[in-house]
Amino acid sequence: MADSHKINFDPVDIEMEVREDENILDAAFRQGIHLMHGCREGRCSACKSYVLDGEIQMESYSTFACNDAEVDEGYVLLCRSHAFSDCTIELLNFDEDELLGGIPIQDVRTQVQAVEPKTRDIVSLRLKPIEPGKFDFKPGQYADLHIPGTDEHRSFSMATTQSRSDEVEFLIKKYPGGKFSALLDGHIQVGDEIALTGPYGSFTLKDGHVLPVVCIGGGAGMAPILSLLRHMNETENSRPARFYYGARTPADLFYLDEILELGKGIKDFRFIACLSESADGEVPGRVTVEEGMVTDVVARHETAIAKTEVYLCGPPPMVDAALMFLDANCVPKDQVFYDSFTSPIFDQ
């Protein structure tokens, strides 16, 4: 059995044990400690922390998430870090309410209820929890779906909320040769069973926050944002909200009627579909459509974006462009929450 070591987290005064054969983030999940995280693959930097004392070694990771100079200074990514002595680690990014009060990670057996195309490459997958009969999560989080017959998984965000405890919806982008998404072309059938593990992620509305919410999404990034909007509608949240969804053409838009209906229950809601290639074609309902990249459309409308909380979710080029725009407009980093589909576990 692997040796264990103690980890002390500063400045929150939390102690836990970690085995040498598990990374620190997984050890925290196992013990009910919910550290800030994103991709869990060493690519997004959400779990970046600073080693004050002790010996830590990292598995492979992206230098975009933690560059060589930072590593030399003592910065690590907890999702890739293994401890080989007792350690003291300074958390750079944490939510004190979440640390010991997050939803426990669950292993759930589910049954496929529906596989429904939404666009040419986005599919709605609806699963019913059967053992246990309920899956707890917060709006905006994601889960691992295990690929049938393998030890592999892919991660997808939930589009639903806890009000639909009998069903969990995922919006999945199909990729040629994708190990999970390719199964949605007739291989996964209604009645099949799929194992699910989660929830993960910090892409959630923060209790007690009052700033207006600006959501910027693209592709399957619709899922967690739709979950947030459904939650805001159900709870009669009083925060103003705007949603900018980037797509190429009208044929790439979906769930428009529901978004408009949700907006009726959200204070000062606005939805704009941003089309980068062509606005020619019919767009149902009273949807506002503007041509251009989603960041350009946001720039035209959000002249005081530094006084908002921004939620980003979509393909890496869109998220990277949005982060550059937000940085140029002096939006504080603690007011920006994002999921960027940077890892194979997200995008196939």
Swiss-Prot record:
Binds 1 2Fe-2S cluster. It comes from the Bacteria. [2Fe-2S] cluster binds at residues 39, 44, 47, 79. PROSITE patterns: 2FE2S_FER_1 (PS00197), 2FE2S_FER_2 (PS51085), FAD_FR (PS51384). It is an enzyme of class 1 (oxidoreductase). Induction: By acetone. Transcriptionally activated by MimR. Gene3D superfamilies: 3.10.20.30, Nucleotide-binding domain of ferredoxin-NADP reductase (FNR) module, Translation factors. One of its GO terms (molecular function) is 2 iron, 2 sulfur cluster binding. Residues 105-206 form the FAD-binding FR-type domain. Its cofactor is FAD; [2Fe-2S] cluster. Residues 5-95 form the 2Fe-2S ferredoxin-type domain. Its EC number is 1.18.1.-. Keywords: 2Fe-2S, FAD, Flavoprotein, Iron, Iron-sulfur, Metal-binding, Oxidoreductase. Pfam families: FAD_binding_6 (PF00970), Fer2 (PF00111), NAD_binding_1 (PF00175). PANTHER family: NADH OXIDOREDUCTASE HCR (PTHR47354), PROTEIN RFBI (PTHR47354:SF5). The propane 2-monooxygenase multicomponent enzyme system is composed of an electron transfer component and a monooxygenase component interacting with the effector protein MimD. The electron transfer component is composed of a reductase (MimB), and the monooxygenase component is formed by a large subunit (MimA) and a small subunit (MimC). Belongs to the bacterial ring-hydroxylating dioxygenase ferredoxin reductase family. Reductase component of the propane 2-monooxygenase multicomponent enzyme system which is involved in the degradation of propane via the O2-dependent hydroxylation of propane. Reductase catalyzes the transfer of electrons from NADH or NADPH to monooxygenase. This is Propane 2-monooxygenase, reductase component. It comes from Mycolicibacterium smegmatis (strain ATCC 700084 / mc(2)155). The lineage of its organism: Bacteria, Bacillati, Actinomycetota, Actinomycetes, Mycobacteriales.
